[in-house]
């Protein structure tokens, strides 16, 4: 068993924390690795290298590259028969990474070095919710496309009372879903979340079970920015959404119910709230790097 840090000059550049490995068998002159067999895939924050197993014999192969993020030379050792390497914690911002392949025999004599250039996909952005601020709404900002005329006015969604409710039309003539709650804001919004409370009722029908969250800048052209499913179908149950980042500002919003419990052609709800959300964005591809 040999540890990379204890090898001869051919491995001098290897990281001393590399895993131990066995180098045995072939003692002939190692043939240079054919770099033309290597393909690369740019993954999110990673580089995947794949190659055809060399026909030539060798004991192990060293793959070296410079990591511009850590500003360190990195050495990976793979055994014969290995046909791929996943390089983690990489960045698209650095462009080409140069990988140097070198085969070795059991005497740690190395072949000529061959090079392959490959690029990383962008590292994933991390989004962290900082706070939510409830938007105070008035009844004149609310509307629906299918109000039940005998009960459940839409203004009840804002009264803070879970014993009152809003109801779309259950009386004849019924129309099929989808049906919506619309908010016309007096200002623009962007990152947001919603909360609502289901109706206080013993019946099992009419609870929203799936809905689209839609936005519009003009109240005419609508875009779905999130779809919700598995919504609660039980009495006086609070639902709180994850935050939504539509990537644009809007001044009109719809909670568009696409299905309801018991296959109802209507839906009901007790309370509805809309929140502005402050989101912290950590983008590994754009943050300043230490000098």
Feature locations, PLM:
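Disordered, acidic Ser/Thr/Pro-rich linker "stalks" and the adjacent N-terminal cap
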Residues: 119-186, 199-205, 280-291
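Beta-strand-rich modules
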Residues: 87-115
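A short beta-strand element within beta-rich, extracytoplasmic domains
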Residues: 189-203, 255
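Short beta-strand segments within Ig-like beta-sandwich modules, predominantly Fibronectin type-III
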Residues: 75-82, 231-233
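Trp- and acidic/polar-enriched beta-sheet ligand-binding modules for extracellular glycan
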Residues: 204-291
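Pro/Thr/Ser/Gly-rich low-complexity, intrinsically disordered linker/stalk tracts
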Residues: 15-57, 112-137, 277-289
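Extracellular low-complexity, O-glycosylation-prone stalks/linkers
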Residues: 55-76, 209-215
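C-terminal motif of bacterial Sec signal peptides marking the signal peptidase cleavage site
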Residues: 10-13
């Amino acid at each position: 068993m040999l540890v990379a840090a204890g090898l001869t000059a051919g491995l001098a550049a290897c990281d001393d924390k590399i895993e131990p490995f066995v180098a045995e068998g072939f003692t002939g002159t190692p043939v240079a690795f054919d770099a033309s067999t290597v393909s690369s895939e740019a993954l999110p924050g990673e580089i995947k290298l794949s190659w055809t197993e060399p026909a030539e014999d060798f004991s192990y192969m060293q793959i070296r590259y410079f990591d511009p993020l850590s500003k360190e030379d990195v050495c990976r050792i793979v055994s014969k028969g290995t046909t791929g390497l996943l390089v983690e914690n990489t960045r698209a911002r650095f462009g080409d990474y140069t990988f140097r392949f070198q085969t070795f025999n059991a005497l740690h004599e190395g072949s000529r070095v061959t090079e392959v250039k490959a690029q990383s996909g962008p590292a994933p952005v991390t989004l962290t919710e900082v706070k939510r601020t409830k938007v105070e709404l008035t009844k004149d900002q609310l509307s629906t496309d299918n109000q039940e005329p005998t009960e459940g006015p839409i203004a009840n969604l804002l009264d803070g009372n879970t014993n009152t409710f809003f109801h779309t039309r259950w009386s004849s003539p019924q129309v099929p879903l989808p049906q919506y709650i619309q908010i016309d804001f007096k200002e623009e919004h962007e990152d947001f979340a919603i909360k609502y409370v289901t109706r206080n009722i013993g019946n099992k029908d009419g609870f929203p079970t799936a809905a689209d969250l839609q936005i519009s800048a003009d109240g005419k052209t609508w875009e779905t920015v999130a779809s919700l499913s598995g919504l609660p179908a039980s009495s006086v149950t609070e639902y709180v959404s994850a935050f939504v980042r539509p990537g644009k500002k809007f001044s009109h919003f719809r909670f568009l119910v696409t299905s309801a419990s018991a296959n109802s052609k209507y839906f009901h709800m007790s309370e509805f709230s809309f929140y502005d959300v402050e989101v912290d964005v950590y983008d590994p591809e754009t943050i300043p790097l230490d000098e």
